[in-house]
């Protein structure tokens, strides 16, 4: 099975890290994967998105035009990518920052209070981890344990408090939808 994922939001929300973690988790599970970041203004607050493909077989192209799953962290990204998700696909959106509902009725919609939960954990910077935890639990493209292992690799060298907040945020996201 091949699954195409789009992560999108503002620069500084950890969008690229989300994609890296999904891709690394998939590799850790012995699957084929591609990771393709795209940036708007190259600064905090500009737009950022990335696409990830996870497959049991080799992947011909890293381009994702019609994702099966969209992990959306802000309103402009929902406006831009809502229409691109395949019918029957999934849209996870950060309802802490997005004040409208998903308009489509032909996709599964998961509302994630990512920033609210991240602040409860200790830092709004972990909102991306909340979203990843919800995605892992609900869709199962990669296992939560694989994402946590990838997190340890990607954030190696960070202080233990930051690591623990990110782990806890991911687990809380999974609990939210579990």
Positions of predicted regions on the chain:
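Active-site cofactor/cluster-binding pocket
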Residues: 1-178
């Amino acid at each position: 099975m091949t699954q195409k994922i789009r992560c999108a939001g503002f620069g500084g929300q950890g969008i690229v890290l989300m994609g890296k973690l999904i891709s690394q988790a998939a590799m850790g599970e012995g699957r084929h994967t591609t990771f393709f970041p795209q940036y708007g203004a190259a600064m905090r607050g500009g737009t950022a998105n990335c696409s990830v493909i996870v497959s049991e077989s080799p992947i011909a192209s890293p381009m994702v035009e019609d994702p099966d799953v969209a992990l959306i962290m802000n309103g402009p990204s929902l406006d831009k990518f809502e229409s691109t998700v395949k019918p029957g696909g999934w849209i996870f959106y950060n309802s802490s920052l997005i004040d409208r509902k998903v308009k489509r009725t032909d996709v599964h919609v998961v509302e994630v209070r990512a920033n609210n939960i991240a602040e409860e954990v200790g830092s709004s910077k972990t909102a991306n981890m909340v979203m990843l935890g919800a995605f892992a639990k609900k869709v199962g493209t990669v296992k939560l344990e694989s994402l946590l292992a990838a997190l340890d690799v990607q954030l190696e060298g960070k202080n233990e408090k930051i690591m623990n907040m990110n782990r806890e945020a991911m687990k809380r996201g999974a609990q939210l939808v579990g």
